[in-house]
């Protein structure tokens, strides 16, 4: 699965979240969240958890 950083940024903006806020809600450090966001490949579990934190469907944050 390929994560779309642009789509994640849009979802974060809708929720008025920073990377720090996202990391706290996800349960990881800010540095680890940056690694997740900047990597192209993401596991199904990780994508699902990220989508849940952002209150979006997982398909909304993946490349098509």
What is each model feature region?
Residues 13, 38, 63:
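Residue-level detection of the helix-turn-helix DNA-binding "recognition helix"
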Residues 1-21, 25:
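A short, Lys/Arg-rich alpha-helix, primarily the initiator
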Residues 27-42:
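Recognition helix of helix-turn-helix/homeodomain-like DNA-binding domains
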Residues 19, 30, 44-47:
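Helix-turn-helix DNA-binding elements, focusing on the entry/boundary residues of the two helices
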Residues 39-52:
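Short, basic-rich loop-to-helix N-cap that marks the start of a DNA-contacting helix
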Residues 55-64:
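Short C-terminal boundary/hinge segments that cap the last helix of small helical domains
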